[in-house]
Structure formats: C-alpha cells, structure tokens
C-alpha cells in the first residue's frame, strides 16, 4: 500500500509517534479515536519502508469517544525510528494520549 493510496482510502488525521530505541513492544493507552483494525506506518528514513500492521485492541465506549488500547508490535526495521501513524476508519480522531512503558 502506498501513501497516495492510503490518502484515497480514507486518511483522516496524522499522528506523530516515536518508538524509543529500547522498546520492541510499545503499548499505547487511552487513544481517543475510532479506526479500523489497521494502522499504517510510514517510515521516515532513507530506507523508505512502509508497513500496514494489525494491532491488538480493546474497545470501550465513553460518551461520544471510542477509546482503544493499542499494543503495537514493532518490527525490527522501525527501531530507532521516528514514524508517522496514519489511522483509517469512518470516524475522525478526537485526541490522543501516549504512555510508554
């Protein structure tokens, strides 16, 4: 999947996301948005690697927000990388809070 195709297929909003070097598994809590089961990663290095990764998620509805707990298994080529997360789905993202541990 190319970036151009991702825009046509329902790109809503861009999140800047940083993987810390020592973490192979990064857990994101209380991400206030609704998407499909996939997140598109655009790798911002000369390697120009892209990935469309499926995530494990727990969905809880609170008022008009949908919170998903995302556990993103980070492939090796994303280590030490600043990447962008493109979220797909019928709803616009309403906010985000990232906790790393």
Swiss-Prot record:
Keyword terms: Membrane, Transmembrane, Transmembrane helix
Membrane topology of the entry: Single-pass membrane protein
Transmembrane regions listed in the UniProt entry: 72-94
Chief location of this protein within or outside the cell: membrane
Domain of life the protein comes from: Eukaryota
Subcellular location: Membrane
GO cellular component: membrane
The protein's name in its UniProt record: Uncharacterized protein C1002.20
Biological source species: Schizosaccharomyces pombe (strain 972 / ATCC 24843)
